[in-house]
């Protein structure tokens, strides 16, 4: 079994989403000891944003690419291959300015590829990644679930993975982290309890 672990917070060791995503992965490994983990730190090893250079590289035959185009093509190919190979994907998605970090969006743009993770048919779009499990670690300073301010965060990720054909999407939440130490502590404690007591109860 293969697990892809994605971190995207810029806060390093001070990051709540990193702490919780690592707890999720450790709990998963305890339940599935044979799991092989691939780790991507999108903040410390950022993927360049989707650009005209990305499109040109994709449209240029491999033998004709220059060094920059080869680099762009390799970034896309590796990110896509890791995602497609994974049975389970753990995505740490802190909220920055009502949406996901720009580093996470850059990764998404490398894996959202027609003919690879989805395709268009006469009946409409069809996801090609059914059967995967996605666990999203959702953190935020405020309380946004069910609010208009949360649409570009959790709702966006639900739509995205659903578009890929993934229906097994779970959220581990620690919200209200900026509402004082007591609220933060409870939010983190509740999230850790969900991970240890509920998330893999059926495993």
Curated annotation (Swiss-Prot):
- The UniProt gene name for this protein comes to azoR5
* Similarity comment: family membership: Belongs to the azoreductase type 1 family.
According to UniProt, the reaction catalysed is: 2 a quinone + NADH + H(+) = 2 a 1,4-benzosemiquinone + NAD(+); N,N-dimethyl-1,4-phenylenediamine + anthranilate + 2 NAD(+) = 2-(4-dimethylaminophenyl)diazenylbenzoate + 2 NADH + 2 H(+)
Source species: Pseudomonas fluorescens (strain ATCC BAA-477 / NRRL B-23932 / Pf-5)
Q: How is the cofactor bound?
A: Binds 1 FMN per subunit.
Keyword set for this entry? Flavoprotein, FMN, NAD, Oxidoreductase
Q: Provide the E.C. number(s) assigned to this enzyme.
A: 1.6.5.-, 1.7.1.17
User: Which InterPro entries would you find in this protein's record?
Assistant: Flavodoxin_fold (IPR003680), Flavoprotein-like_sf (IPR029039), FMN-dep_NADH:Q_OxRdtase_AzoR1 (IPR050104), NADH:quinone_OxRdtase_FMN_depd (IPR023048)
Which molecular-function annotation in GO is an example for this chain?
Answer: oxidoreductase activity, acting on NAD(P)H as acceptor
* Binding-site residues, FMN: 9, 15-17, 95-98, 139-142
Assembly mode: Homodimer.
What job does the chain carry out?
A: Quinone reductase that provides resistance to thiol-specific stress caused by electrophilic quinones. Also exhibits azoreductase activity. Catalyzes the reductive cleavage of the azo bond in aromatic azo compounds to the corresponding amines.
Q: Name one Pfam family in it.
A: Flavodoxin_2
- Protein name, per record: FMN-dependent NADH:quinone oxidoreductase 5
Q: Which cofactor does it need?
A: FMN
Q: Which principal EC class is assigned to this enzyme?
A: oxidoreductase
For the keyword S-adenosyl-L-methionine, the answer is no
């Amino acid at each position: 079994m293969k697990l892809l672990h994605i971190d995207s917070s810029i806060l390093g060791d001070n990051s709540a989403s990193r702490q919780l995503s690592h707890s999720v992965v450790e709990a998963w490994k305890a339940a599935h000891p044979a799991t092989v983990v691939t780790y991507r730190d999108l903040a410390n090893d950022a993927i360049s944003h989707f650009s005209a250079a990305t499109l040109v590289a994709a449209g240029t035959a491999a033998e004709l690419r220059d060094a920059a185009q080869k680099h762009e093509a390799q970034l896309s190919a590796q990110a896509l291959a890791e995602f497609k190979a994974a049975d389970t994907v753990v995505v740490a998605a802190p909220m920055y300015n009502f949406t996901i970090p720009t580093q996470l969006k850059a990764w998404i743009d490398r894996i959202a590829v027609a003919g690879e993770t989805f395709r268009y048919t006469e009946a409409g779009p069809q996801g090609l990644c059914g059967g995967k499990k996605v666990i999203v670690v959702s953190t935020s300073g405020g309380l946004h679930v069910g609010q208009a301010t949360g649409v570009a965060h959790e709702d966006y990720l639900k739509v995205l993975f659903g578009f890929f054909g993934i229906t097994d999407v779970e959220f581990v939440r620690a919200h209200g982290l900026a509402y004082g130490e007591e609220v933060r502590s409870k939010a983190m404690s509740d999230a850790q309890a969900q991970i240890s007591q509920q998330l893999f109860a059926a495993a």
